[in-house]
Amino acid sequence: MKKMNKLVRGCMVLVSAAMLASCSDSFLEQDPLSFYNPGNTYTTESGLRSAMAMCDLGLKEMLMDGNGNVLPIASLYFMTDIGLYAKTDAGFFMDDFANKITPTSGMKGGGDENAMSRFWDRGWTSIKFANTVLSYVDQVQSLDEKVRNEYKGRAYFHRAYGYYHQALLFGDIPLVTKIIEVPKQNYKSTSKEAIFQMLVHDLEFAVQNVPAQKDMPYMGTVNQEACMQLLIKCYLVTGEYKKAEDMATDLINNHGLKLMDAPFGSLVTGNSTTWPVERNVVWDLHRGENVSIAENKETIMPILNFHSQSWINYPLMRAMCVHWSNSVIM
């Protein structure tokens, strides 16, 4: 047994010595199989599509927080006289602006106060990818002018959507219209008025070059109707009310859109033992099966959310419907 232990120890010493002797400086030299070069990635149409996909994802993440409680899209109403955060069991929510609200109230994210931070951090991410498309699209040689302008129009939409919310929520902010290639710390704010003038200019280009939904083979990405709707909102901000009215009239009358006034689509009965449903148009409008179908004339541009494709929890009822069983509301 003693001889065996000595033999094992001897073998371990020999192996360790061999490993130390064979490890040289060349062993530590990097040998990467590839390098990430934006100039190579985004000068192909597949690279542009990947950046545009990140813009589409950013639009969804900007509106849908997914933390199980509050939603960014609902937070836009919490800061107005339209509504109040309905999750009354949270213990803290924006129901007393005079005493509770500060410039950064709820901005830490993930809490129950609001989800305004999503419009800030995810807005900048969407702006970054939109600027990436705009910076490289002219270098993609395989694109004809029509397709090139479609990419530009969709990128303008995503950049405008990010800045629309940021400028209205936070006021004067830095205006970034190109890729930041080196660290930058000397940002300066641009007036909200100047930002919206740029958004109007960009969206007018988008309306002229992004195809209508009827001319697109798929749903869930930016269409002409969405560009028109965002341009209408920007016209209202800049005080160009006649242009907003004319654009809205065009959108309604010439793009097959209208308010639904009768039941349509698939009948989803729900759980009759919990709440028996008498079919009506409002019920049908809020069934997931009916959101993106051709019969639904209220949908301008759907945001697709599937378990197989970057699913994000969407707790709309948690944020918008009062928790009646809690004593906080009494």
Each model region followed by its residue ranges:
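Short linear capping/connector segments at secondary-structure termini
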Residues: 33-37, 177-184
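Conserved, well-structured interaction surfaces
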Residues: 45-67, 87-170, 186, 190-194, ...
